[in-house]
């Protein structure tokens, strides 16, 4: 197996990524999850988290580690992913990134985007801190969140001090990491999984029915009973947010909610494939027909 190799396995919701991973040899690779809902504790069924069986077969990272009220974004993913890559290389394990978030895959491969625009709320907050607590407080805060940037700029350059904090507060990523962007990952094997759209529609319908059979309704009631609601970041995921409509419209039929989940899932699959098709140098496979070829590529 090539030294320092990194594998990407991506494809739309319900394409069959988990089935592929069950065929991995034990102890050779570890999975880094590339999904924005499976990261949350308690939100299990509609997020289609890797099964206990799969997680026992091959270790997974970035699954089930955030509280539902916490925000998850590119900055958190990128920071965690880079650390995991380094740790796995020390252990001589193969990092395999698996999921459906094309946005995260793109920026992991090609580096972070240029420093983003900052909301007026963040800018006002930083200015308020400067007015009420002074420059030294901002410097101490910068030292805490981005020591590299703190060391590299003049302690009297209030513009850069403020800007550095604005970027961190907006994204969760130190500005020093943005300034290093363009450092593309090398030795990436990108494998895409795809099926005909009618096949995908059938699989989505089966998946949603299985969610209901596995207790999704009970999970939703439990989550709402704990006080989670439309402001909870984890509730933004498909399969969860639709039930908030049911909560506000109790006379809606469960069947209507199920049909809405199927519809939203299929639209999401289309958006995913549009984004994935723009990523260059991807080897595309049907996950059922080409299983041996895929495994040979990954583990040679």
UniProtKB/Swiss-Prot annotation:
Keyword Ligase tagged? no
Q: In Gene Ontology terms, what is one molecular function of this protein?
A: ATP binding
Alphabetically sorted, this entry's keywords are:
ATP-binding, Magnesium, Nucleotide-binding, Transferase, tRNA processing
Task: Please name the GO terms of the biological process aspect recorded for this protein, alphabetically.
Answer: tRNA modification
Annotated positions binding substrate: 13-18
**Subunit (UniProt):** Monomer.
**Role description:** Catalyzes the transfer of a dimethylallyl group onto the adenine at position 37 in tRNAs that read codons beginning with uridine, leading to the formation of N6-(dimethylallyl)adenosine (i(6)A).
Protein name, please? tRNA dimethylallyltransferase
Give the taxonomic lineage as stored in the record: Bacteria, Pseudomonadati, Spirochaetota, Spirochaetia, Spirochaetales
* Name of the gene encoding the protein in the UniProt record: miaA
